[in-house]
């Protein structure tokens, strides 16, 4: 998937008897968009071809969301889409209003620096959802991954123009 398409989240188990699915959201912008809307569905299964789908409805439910798609009307049909990732054309994203706003996808590839501005050999590879808080997944040049909670106590300023993210006391993560 290219940068023209932004990952919105991953589909979970069916919900109810009318073909709804749970959605683990990566970007909450989906709630701001007018439905119906055309999205791409992709699964990490080579037997499941990427396809364009139409999102008919999205609702908040228990801290997450449930979604309904065109042509999916039973739990059995919905079950085929479990684990699928939803992608939105980047051009449909609402514009960022302030310096402190960003999309998760904008963070991927940021260079880690320490509080003094010293460049670390870590790049941000992914942001994983976690019930308590998001987890930043950094990868070192040697391929080793380092997981850091996305909390103010560990993460300082983000500078999308300079492509950097400040890590507070990064040496503690090297020892773990």
Curated annotation (Swiss-Prot):
Keyword rRNA processing attached: yes
Protein location? Cytoplasm
Specify where it is mainly localized.
Answer: cytoplasm
Which cellular component terms (GO) are annotated to the entry? cytoplasm; ribosome
**Span of domain PRC barrel:** 99-174
Pfam families in UniProt: PRC_RimM, RimM
Source species, domain of life: Bacteria
Q: Name one GO biological process term.
A: ribosomal small subunit biogenesis
Q: Which InterPro entries is this protein grouped with?
A: PRC_barrel-like_sf (IPR011033), PRC_RimM (IPR056792), RimM (IPR011961), RimM_N (IPR002676), RimM_N_sf (IPR036976), Transl_B-barrel_sf (IPR009000)
Has UniProt tagged this entry with the keyword Kinase? Answer: no
Which of UniProt's keywords are assigned here? Chaperone, Cytoplasm, Ribosome biogenesis, rRNA processing
UniProt-recorded Gene Ontology molecular function terms: ribosome binding
Q: Which Gene3D superfamilies match?
A: PRC-barrel domain, RimM
Task: Please give the function described in this protein's UniProt entry.
Answer: An accessory protein needed during the final step in the assembly of 30S ribosomal subunit, possibly for assembly of the head region. Essential for efficient processing of 16S rRNA. May be needed both before and after RbfA during the maturation of 16S rRNA. It has affinity for free ribosomal 30S subunits but not for 70S ribosomes.
The entry sums up its family as follows: Belongs to the RimM family.
Subunit record text? Binds ribosomal protein uS19.
Return the domain comment text from this UniProt entry.
Answer: The PRC barrel domain binds ribosomal protein uS19.
State the protein's name: Ribosome maturation factor RimM
Q: Which organism is it from?
A: Leptospira interrogans serogroup Icterohaemorrhagiae serovar copenhageni (strain Fiocruz L1-130)
């Amino acid at each position: 998937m290219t940068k023209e398409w932004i990952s919105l989240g991953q589909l979970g188990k069916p919900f109810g008897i009318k073909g709804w699915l749970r959605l683990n959201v990566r970007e909450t912008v989906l709630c701001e968009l007018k439905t119906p809307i055309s999205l791409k569905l992709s699964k990490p299964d080579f037997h499941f071809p990427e396809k364009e789908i139409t999102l008919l409805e999205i609702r908040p439910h228990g801290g997450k969301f449930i979604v309904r798609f065109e042509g999916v009307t039973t739990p059995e049909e919905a079950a085929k889409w479990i684990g699928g990732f939803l992608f939105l054309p980047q051009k449909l994203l609402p514009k960022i209003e302030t310096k402190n706003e960003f999309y998760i996808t904008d963070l991927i590839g940021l260079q880690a620096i320490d509080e003094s501005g010293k460049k670390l050999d870590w790049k941000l590879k992914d942001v994983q959802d976690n019930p308590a808080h998001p987890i930043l997944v950094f990868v070192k040049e040697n391929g080793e991954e380092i997981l850091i909670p996305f909390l103010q106590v560990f993460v300082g300023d983000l500078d999308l123009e300079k492509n950097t993210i400040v890590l507070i006391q990064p040496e503690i993560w090297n020892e773990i």
